[in-house]
UniProtKB/Swiss-Prot annotation:
Pfam family, one: ADDB_N
Enzyme Commission numbers on file: 3.1.-.-
Originating species: Clostridium botulinum (strain ATCC 19397 / Type A)
NCBIfam families reported in the protein's UniProt record: addB_Gpos
Name of the gene this protein is made from: addB
Cofactor: Mg(2+); [4Fe-4S] cluster
Quaternary structure, from the entry: Heterodimer of AddA and AddB.
Protein's recorded name: ATP-dependent helicase/deoxyribonuclease subunit B
Organism domain of life: Bacteria
Keyword Protein biosynthesis: no
Amino acid sequence: MSLRFIYGRAGSGKSQYCLNSIKNRIEEDIDRPLILLVPEQFSFQAEKNLIEVLDEKTGFKTQVLSFKRMAYRVFNEVGGITAKHMNESGKSMLLYNIIEDNKNNLKVFKKAAKRQGFITTISDIITEFKRYNITPEIILNNLENIEGDNLKYKMEDLALIFSQFETRLHKNYIDNEDDLTILAEKLNKSKQFDNAEIWIDEFSSFSPQEYSVLEKLLLKSYRINITLCTDYLNQGRFVDTTDVFSPIKNTENKLLQIIEDNNIKLDKPIALKCDPCARFKNSAELQHLEKNMFSFPYKEYKNETKDICMLKTLNQFTEIENTAKDIIKLCIDKGCRFKDIAVITGDLEGYENIISSVFLQYNIPFFIDKKREINNNPIIVLILSALEVLSKNWTYESVFRYLKTGLLDINNEEMDILENYVLANGIKGYQWTNDKLWEYKSFSNYELEDQVEKELLAKINDIRYKAMEPIVTLNKNFKSIDKAKEFCEVLYEFLCNINLPDKIQNMIEDFKVEGEIEKASEYNQIWNIVMEVLDQIVEVIGEEKISLKEFFKILQTGLSEYEIGLIPPTLDQVMVGSITRLRSHNINTLYIVGVNDGIFPSPLKEEGILSDDDRKFLGDKGLEIAKDTKSIAFEEQFLVYSTLTTPSKYLRLSYPIADGEGKTLRPSIIISRIKKIFTNICEENDIVKLNGEEEELKNISSAKPTFNYLISNLRKDVEGAKIDNIWGDTYKWYLENEFWIEKLNRLIKGFDYTNQSKYIETKKIRNLYGKPLKISVSRVEKFSQCPFAYFVQYGLKAKDRKIFNLSYPDLGIFMHSILEKFSHELEKQGLEWDTMDLNWAEEEIDKLINEELDNKSLDILNSSKRYEYVTKSVKKILKRSIWLIGEHIKRGNFKPSYYELSFDIDGDYPPIAMELHSGEVVNLIGRVDRVDLLQKDGATYLKIIDYKSGAKEFKLSDVYYGLQLQLLIYLDAILTELAERSGINGEPGALLYLKLDDPIVKNTVDMSDEEIEKSIIKNLKMKGLILNDPNVIRDMDNIISGISDIIPVMVKKDGGVSEGRSSVATKEEFETLRKYVRYTIIEICEEMLEGNIEIKPYKKKDGSSCDYCIYSSVCKFDTNIRGNKYNILIDKKDEEVWDDIKKKLEC
């Protein structure tokens, strides 16, 4: 019985020493068992290495074991396992059931139990307890030593859950985590390790369970040899936590304590001192890095490096692209094999998709060493969403998640038809399952669409029944059962009824034919996992009574614990993985990507259920559990050391300066540390683009990515830029290659591509727009924003998918409608705005809204609590608005005379006729919200008011650009009609926008009601253009003094208007605007009828017409495409606008 340490720094040859020692023992023909004990993840590599050292005849004399394998060997020899193992999925389902049963008895975790991930957290802490040999009884016996209620109650909850878990588990099962505890007990009876010599390699630490096993092995074996990656042995002394080798030295101390307690001999250690070490014999740079990375003081390496390189990149994509180029270069220039290369990162999740995409493009064979979650696999999605449909009562999300799995007998066209119908009509819940046929209706401006053809409606209902029938049957079968076992049986029957097993088998065969072996393996495993989870539910809680919702949660919990492990399909491929899963030292070349702060080294992990303080307190009381986060952070140093010393020939560290969203990333402290050691390190970057053939050569690698670079350079050449001669030779190579020539020619033709189609035939436009042209003024403004957007919306009549909701425009129309009805009711009752009773007015608003909802069958406003809130908000806004209108009218002499004044064939006034230069007449239609009149000095002054549910400014420059024409053309039309029809001398008074809102007034505690009302009036001040006449202005605001709080005007002390602080125009200027608006509309309409459909959105300093355009996917506007340019509109000062308008009218 003895223990011997084999120690040395990384790369010193410890593993090789073990293999050679085993070989020597075999050659010496010593008759004793020879065992190599390694971590589970290293067992495959260790077996390979052992076979390489030993010949086929002697290889069988040595066993390569992990602790788990050792346990199975002993159990097979002496017995001990009479029950089946429960996997992580079964444990999670059992824990969920225990927590649900005991949630009212939990003191700390009652609320936390509902949180996602809580079951996994509890499972992890129980695993931790078991690995540290802590039982529920030990926790209970130590409760009296715990001070502080929070920790005490926490441990009581954990003891309760842990105790019931153990009791229920051991009825039929055994936990995987119990294997080593049982192994330690059974080793006394085992004979296979008697007098054995054991080599233990690749461990940096052990759990208490493993120490118990080692103690028993030490008492039975001839000798145990343990490798320690350290510079020197600690020999039981105090360990400095800042020492990079502190985890190893802690392990050494614990092993020394075991042999001291058992009076076991300590053999002379084997010290593997080397310079250089075997691993770094071909690289002085890597040897220097190993020696100095964590040495203080360190020694500088002043020569230029070639084996250690750094790369600074613009983002993660260019980082991986540069990595791929470097891998290709190494393989071509230096004969490196893909299997000798590894790419690792501290953020595999963030890099996985980028690496997959880039490496596939560069034809680099690779395998991502990680277990895949199964939650997003279509089979799992189908099962869980089918149950979610029932547990959540047929919500849109759950139904279409189920239907879109691709595993049902519904094709994509049927899916789209059904989904469009459901979205347009807000179908959910009982509407899916009632016997009534669906009637086609949709919500838009309170009007039902025309009846859809009977064939389409019948088709929709057929698809509906085909979609819902299996789940309706499933629900029917669920209603007659209440046991977990029965739920599993019914679900399995459902899966068979939809032919899921056969469909999965067909998919697996298809994947194999297409060469997608990983996919085939994944789908094969998934079905087996589903069956395994159902079996475990039956065996663990099969006879317990549960509800459908509980069954859904239990199944979801069980499936969420599964991950799929895939086997590398070939040997010669680049290994891609996480820093923590780096498995082999047989790596020549290592790329560490994402060497950024917070990624490598990894940041401190969250403390979990037990905080650092909790762990320290429990440790002080004799309850040793896993290390706190600070201790783990110190141990991270050793992980960094192990990672950096893994490659034997070449190491490259790269870091981007920004992530995928453009957020700044800082380089890791590792970068600065290495730069200090290697003062002349090879450092590259792709941020500053260098010119020259040597730089261009870096972009020539595999055919596909090189082709992309070629096309980019050919485009530059076409556009007149100078490119390197090397691309001419590259172009010739692709021209001579049959596979590429067609693609090359096709893409070169694409250089002439433009998405522009500036004009189409007048005849076609006439067919689309109609003749004679009859359009609203708002459409004219739309054309000014972008001719193409107008064409798509009003020519092609393209519509966005209809959704059952109340859009902002719908809300505005609804409020306009209520205000119009209220205004007419006011007239009908013979009441005036300025004298009406406010209580009556508010009751009338309530009544009108309720009537409107009933009459129009607007189910949406009663469809949810949210829309009920919207209805209440609309009532408040409208009540505030009628109060505000009344206050405005009280302040002036203008009287409301017209409401919703319309210009149309059947309107209050005829359409506004605009004669084009060709003699053709265009009819403009529209509606004015309100017109107030003032009779004064033989003239009738008009105040035109437009109600707006959002903010709206009046800008003279927008009038100039044709973006704000409505109020001016309505003014012109009304003045013209008054003069021609009635002989009335009409004059412009004001054009105003009134915002419909109920603003919140802040800091009202010390304000009187009058002050609050004044604040609201000021907040809702109207915007627009006012006649520059002090007398008329006072007729709009008779208490004006200084700045008006209802209109955009400021008067001076002498009574005159402050033009610089007011939005005003003289009578002559209004007349000029009337002429200009007519001129502009004629120009726009002529352009429209000439077939102008140019993609030309406007752009101003505060935004562009593209910002909220729904047709961007149609036009694909991009300033990088030839001919795609914004129509830049400069915000001009009013003086400039007046000058430009006059110049245009003079032409």
